[in-house]
Amino acid sequence: MGKAVKKKYSGASSGGKEVDAEKHLTTVFKFNTDLGQHILKNPLVAQGIVDKAQIKPSDIVLEIGPGTGNLTVRILEQARKVVAVEFDPRMAAELTKRVHGTPVEKKLEILLGDFMKTELPYFDVCISNTPYQISSPLVFKLINQPKPPRVSILMFQREFAMRLLARPGDSLYCRLSANVQMWANVTHIMKVGKNNFRPPPKVESSVVRIEIKNPRPQVDFNEWDGLLRIVFVRKNRTIAAGFKSTTVLEILEKNYKAFLATQSAVPTTSSGDSLINEVKEKIEQVLSETGLAEKRAGKCDQTDFLKLLYGFHQVGIHFA
C-alpha cells in the first residue's frame, strides 16, 4: 500500500468566516460532485458532529475529506493533532490558506491522496463528512486497522447509514449490516438535510457513531466475510440454496483441499480428483446439525452465523 504525499500545515479560523469562505470558493473552482464534494455549510451541524466525538485534549483525530475545513477548524480547537486526508489538491490548498498563521498552526497535517491507498498513522478518533462512493470500503478499512480508533463519527448517505443500523428481519438488513455489527457497535446520531451542504446532494444524510468492540471477537475477518458473501447473495433465499451454486462449491472444494494439505490428511480420493461430493456432504451435515438449512439470511442474527461458521470449521470447510 503506497504512502500518500505528506504536507504539514496548521491553524484554525473562527466559524463566522465560513459563509464568506464558501462564497469565495464558488468563484475559484467548481465542486466535483463525482468525488463526493458536498461541503457541509451549517455551522451548528458541524459543531454537533465534533461535540459527539467527545475529543480529549490528548487525542489525535483523523479527518477524511476535510474539504474547506468547516469541521477541521472545530476539531483543531479540541484535539492535540489533526491528520486530514484530502484527495483534491485544490481543497488542500484552500484548507491550507484557511488555517495559515493561526495559534494552532502546528496541530494540522494534511495527507494528500486517495484515502483507500493511504498508509494511516496512529489516531484515536475519526471524523468524516464521507465521500459517499467510498462509504463501505472506508468503514471496513477503519474496522481492520491494527489499532482501530476509539470512536468514529461519520456522515453517510441516509440509506447507507440505515443499512449499518438494520437488524435481522428489517428490509435493509444485509451483508453490510451483519458484517459491521460483528466488529462494532453502531448508533444513529442525527439526520442532516441536503440543504445543509453546498452544493446540495441528491439524497439526505445521517451521522452515525461507530465504536469498535474491545476486545475484538476472536473470529477471522476473512472467514466471517467469506461466509456472509455466500449466504447474502440473495438474502431471502434459504441458507441451503446459497451453497448449491457451482461457483461456491468449487471455491469451497479448493479451500477444503488446502485445509487437508495443512493437516497432512489423506482425502477419500486422489489429490487430482474432485472432492465436490465430499464437500456437498459436509455442507449438508452442517446445515442439518445447526438447523439453519431452511432459514433465510435476512432473518439470521450474529449467533446463527457464528453457529454456521463454527460448524463448517469443525468439518474442515473454510471460506478464505
UniProtKB/Swiss-Prot annotation:
Record carries keyword Oxidoreductase: no
SMART domains the UniProt entry points to: rADc
Disulfide bonds: none
Reactions mediated catalytically: adenosine(1779)/adenosine(1780) in 18S rRNA + 4 S-adenosyl-L-methionine = N(6)-dimethyladenosine(1779)/N(6)-dimethyladenosine(1780) in 18S rRNA + 4 S-adenosyl-L-homocysteine + 4 H(+)
EC number(s) on file: 2.1.1.183
Entry keyword set: Methyltransferase, RNA-binding, rRNA processing, S-adenosyl-L-methionine, Transferase
GO CC field: nucleolus
Binding site for S-adenosyl-L-methionine: H38, L40, G65, E86, D114, N129
InterPro entries on file: KsgA/Erm, rRNA_Ade_Mease_Trfase_CS, rRNA_Ade_methylase_Trfase_N, rRNA_adenine_dimethylase, SAM-dependent_MTases_sf
GO molecular function, one term: RNA binding
NCBIfam families membership: ksgA
Main function: Specifically dimethylates two adjacent adenosines in the loop of a conserved hairpin near the 3'-end of 18S rRNA in the 40S particle.
Family in the record: Belongs to the class I-like SAM-binding methyltransferase superfamily. rRNA adenine N(6)-methyltransferase family.
Protein name: Dimethyladenosine transferase
Source organism per UniProt: Kluyveromyces lactis (strain ATCC 8585 / CBS 2359 / DSM 70799 / NBRC 1267 / NRRL Y-1140 / WM37)
Organism placement in taxonomy: Eukaryota, Fungi, Dikarya, Ascomycota, Saccharomycotina
Gene giving rise to this polypeptide: DIM1
